[in-house]
Amino acid sequence: MALSWKSFVNVPGILADLRSFNFSVYGRWFGYINILLCLALGIANIFHFSIVIAFAIVAIVQGLLLIFVEVPILLKICPLSDNFIGLVKKCDTNGRRTLLYTALAIVQYASLSVQVTSLLAVAIGLTISAIFYGTGYLKKQEFLEGNVIRNPTDPAFMREAAVREVL
């Protein structure tokens, strides 16, 4: 039994998300992009010989925080403190995510006062997520989880036998 990405990714669910016009879903998609931006550009900027290193480290930490905010299943998998889990679980509404992303973006915009670097892309990405979550909050839209990963009850979801075969 061959494994494919379609075993894990719910393509019809992704298309339904895009057609939903729910801004919390769009904010979550940009949140995934922000995770990659924060980690990649944080690592890339850590090689500067100025105070930009501090902002690069902050970007990496922001990326790690966003992983747990945007992929809540990791809170159950990873051994974390109860305080951290409680903090992340507080970000479960459009309004709170708007505030979180705005605060993270402000920190990265502050890095521009030292030197203009690629961390500007991180700040812009965080701002876009904040705008999407803020729009969802102002429109009083329900906060939705995305449909990217298949539900284990889905018949197309990979079963234990396939997992054993991979291992």
Swiss-Prot record:
GO terms for biological process: vesicle-mediated transport. It is a multi-pass membrane protein. Glycans are attached at residue 22. Keywords: Glycoprotein, Golgi apparatus, Membrane, Transmembrane, Transmembrane helix. It is found in: Golgi apparatus membrane. GO terms for cellular component: Golgi membrane. It comes from the Eukaryota. Its main location: Golgi. It holds the Pfam family Cg6151-P. The keyword Lipid biosynthesis does not apply. InterPro entries: TVP18/Ca-channel_flower. PANTHER family: CALCIUM CHANNEL FLOWER HOMOLOG. Belongs to the TVP18 family. Golgi membrane protein involved in vesicular trafficking. This is Golgi apparatus membrane protein TVP18. It comes from Eremothecium gossypii (strain ATCC 10895 / CBS 109.51 / FGSC 9923 / NRRL Y-1056) (Yeast). The lineage of its organism: Eukaryota, Fungi, Dikarya, Ascomycota, Saccharomycotina. The gene is TVP18.
